[in-house]
Amino acid sequence: MIATSRAVNMNKESKHKKAVAKPCRERQTSVTRAMRPAVARDPRRLSTSSSPSSSPMSAQRRLSREEIINEMEKEQDAIVVRLLREIETLKEENSRLKNQLHHPVPARRSSPFFEGESAILDDDDCNYGYTLDTPKLKLTDGASRHTVLPLTPKDSMTHISHSARRSSRNASISNGTSISDTIFPIETKIHSAPTTNRNLPSADLPHHTLLPRSLSGISSSDLTESGALLHDRRRRSSNYSLDGSNSLKADLMAKRFQTGSLK
């Protein structure tokens, strides 16, 4: 009985302790639960705690976006300006090239004295004659090569003299005469006679048709003396023939024996 009473008392004390301890826990939890929502739901604390932390971050974000947009606009403006300048330079170059195509620059400027004159080129003599008919360059053919043009300067006279020398040279070569005949045409005209008149005396020859202007007023005795001098000069130059053949020299010696000029 004693053991049972003690056990009952111990059980009662433990139950009483548990009952006393429970309301304290419940009071603490109720107080804490009542305090926590009041602190969390206070609008003043929410405004004071959240506004200073959120406003500078949003301001920084807005400023960075505006700066990026401004920088992009500046870059686009610079690109547009550069492209406009390139377009202007290309337009100027295009207009300059068009002007050069429509109005070509002359390669060389001619003197005003020869602007309205045309050059006539001779293939053999390379002598130039100028006429006043057309401003273009002309090349003459073989038929009109030796024609005399009106209003020709000094070069055309040299052209005529060269052509006369060329014709006399060709005639001397075809007849088998020496270079001395072409060098001294006056003495060949005076002392050379055709084949039919070789046996005639010198007095019967028609001197008036063969004498040049400078010898027209000279007597026959003077002519014979001058003819002898010319034949001496001709004798010195007769050693040179065109091709160095002995047949031409023999012909010349025969001519001199017939005319009686050989001493």
UniProtKB/Swiss-Prot annotation:
Compartments, record wording: Cytoplasm; Nucleus
Region ranges (Disordered): 1-62, 149-176
Note: Present with 2100 molecules/cell in log phase SD medium.
GO cellular component: cytoplasm; nucleus
Function (record text): May be a component of a protein phosphatase type 2A (PP2A) complex. Negatively regulates SIT4 phosphatase, a modulators of caffeine sensitivity.
Phosphoserine PTM positions: 172, 192, 214, 238
Top-level taxon of the source organism: Eukaryota
Low complexity bias (residue ranges): 46-61
Species per Swiss-Prot/TrEMBL record: Saccharomyces cerevisiae (strain ATCC 204508 / S288c)
Annotated keywords: Cytoplasm, Nucleus, Phosphoprotein
Protein name: Protein phosphatase type 2A regulatory subunit RTS3
